[in-house]
Amino acid sequence: MEVTLQLNCSNIDFNNVCEILKRVGMGYFDGEVHKKAFENSHSVVFAFHEEQMIGFGRAISDGAYEAAVYDIAVVPEYQGNGVGKLIMESIIQRLSHCNIILFASPGKEPFYQKLNFRKLKTGMAIFVREEQMHSAGFTE
């Protein structure tokens, strides 16, 4: 399967980004909010198969030594084919000089561990949607 990666937001349908996030069970907002988030990110990756968006991800960074990965999603029927790995490798390559953190969806930790991510012992967060994050298994 041939996958093409796009490393910018040109001609991206952010309503489709919302639909993919819904399909994979991740949090989502309206298209304009996601457009703002991706356009203001340090690194973005959109994966396409035959001109159809099948996945994406992004990272925010200070560009010096810290970065955080967000919104890694692959359409369910394309999961398990290396698409997520391609997206993550593209992001990691551009941030190789940085410490990189992320929130893994519960159950997806092994995927990130294969990419050399390790669980944090002291990670903490303040969430706008605290109850939702707790019920989804992100917080104690």
Task: Report each predicted region and the residues it spans.
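A conserved beta-strand-loop-helix scaffold within acyl/acetyltransferase catalytic domains
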Residues: 29-73
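Conserved catalytic-core motifs of GNAT/GCN5-like acyltransferases
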Residues: 101-103, 113, 118-136
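Short amphipathic alpha-helix that is part of the acyltransferase structural core
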Residues: 1-32, 123, 133-140
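Conserved acetyl-CoA pyrophosphate-binding loop and the N-cap/start of the following alpha-helix
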Residues: 78, 82-87
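Conserved GNAT acetyl-CoA-binding A-motif
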Residues: 93-106
